[in-house]
From Swiss-Prot:
This is Guanine nucleotide exchange factor MSS4 homolog. Belongs to the DSS4/MSS4 family. The keyword NADP does not apply. The keyword Membrane applies. Guanine-nucleotide-releasing protein that acts on members of the sec4/ypt1/rab subfamily such as Rab8. During egg development, essential for establishing and maintaining epithelial cell polarity by regulating the correct polarized deposition of basal membrane (BM) proteins such as trol/Pcan and vkg/Coll IV to the basal surface of follicular epithelial (FE) cells. Likely to function by restricting the activity of the vesicle transport regulator Rab8 to the basal membrane, and thus directs BM protein-containing vesicles to the basal side of the FE cells. It is a peripheral membrane protein. PANTHER family: GUANINE NUCLEOTIDE EXCHANGE FACTOR MSS4 (PTHR13276:SF0). Interacts with Rab8. Residues 9-120 form the MSS4 domain. InterPro entries: Mss4, Mss4-like_sf, Mss4/transl-control_tumour. Disruption phenotype: RNAi-mediated knockdown in follicle cells results in the apical localization of the basal membrane (BM) proteins trol and vkg. Results in the apical secretion of vkg, which associates with the apical plasma membrane with an adherent organization. No effect of the localization of proteins involved in intracellular trafficking such as aPKC, dlg and arm. GO terms for biological process: polarized secretion of basement membrane proteins in epithelium; post-Golgi vesicle-mediated transport; protein transport; small GTPase-mediated signal transduction. It is found in: Basal cell membrane. It comes from Drosophila melanogaster (Fruit fly).
Length: 122
């Protein structure tokens, strides 16, 4: 179970109030007002996997707060993983840390997890 976080300060008129950046290298991923707030619980692999996991299983956590980006070209800088169970996972294109969200292949929409990024303009 994930701890509840309050992201209300990051949302203005249903959009991201400030730029969205990688929490590790500060790379700009998404400019302000480009993502739409979306709540939907989805299991996303942990950023750090446990050593004792089997090769075909990923340790994951349920996340529910996302920035919805309908066109992948909207991103300033994002990377995509190989396809896993009908999804591609989003990573920082500069430092390759992640996943910071996922890309749904059926809708072609991207979901950037608020919990996995930082929100700041500089």
């Amino acid at each position: 179970m994930t701890e509840e976080a309050d992201f209300s300060e990051q949302i203005t008129d249903g959009k991201n109030k400030s730029n969205v950046r990688c929490q590790f290298c500060n790379c700009l991923m998404l400019k302000a007002q480009e993502g739409t707030y979306n709540q939907e619980e989805v299991d996303v692999p942990l950023m750090t996997q446990k050593q004792d996991r089997t090769a075909d299983s990923l340790n994951s956590e349920p996340l529910k707060d996302f920035w919805l980006v309908k066109d992948m070209m909207t991103f300033e800088n994002i990377g995509f993983s190989n396809t896993v169970d009908g999804r591609k996972f989003l990573v920082c294109a500069d430092c390759e840390r992640g996943p910071v969200g996922y890309h749904d292949l059926s809708t072609r929409h991207c979901y950037l997890a608020l919990k996995r990024v930082v929100h700041k303009d500089t």
